[in-house]
Amino acid sequence: PHVLQGIEEYKGKNIVYSLGNFCFGGNKNPSDKDTMIFQQTFTVENGELVEDDVTNIIPCSLSSESGYNNYQPMVLEGSEKERVLQKIEEFSAALNQ
């Protein structure tokens, strides 16, 4: 889908169902511009995975303009960042019941 969805934990691993449209040229003004960067860090020592639970979610908008898509994604800050994090949390809660 072209919208954010939740993150499910399955057998101790993350399933990220949709990041939304990070950079999307198919619509001049999508109604939902929310997107995210999902970072997953893996630590390998001596060829063995020792840690894989370090994650970071960076809320973004697919446009740096609110009225149209200028095809310049931007990292969100402040209340907009918190709004998107809350949205992801709500979607994720429904998946992890």
Question: Model segments located where?
Answer:
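Conserved beta-sheet core of the metallophosphoesterase superfamily
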Residues: 1-38, 44
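A short C-terminal boundary segment appended to hydrolase-like catalytic domains
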Residues: 31-97
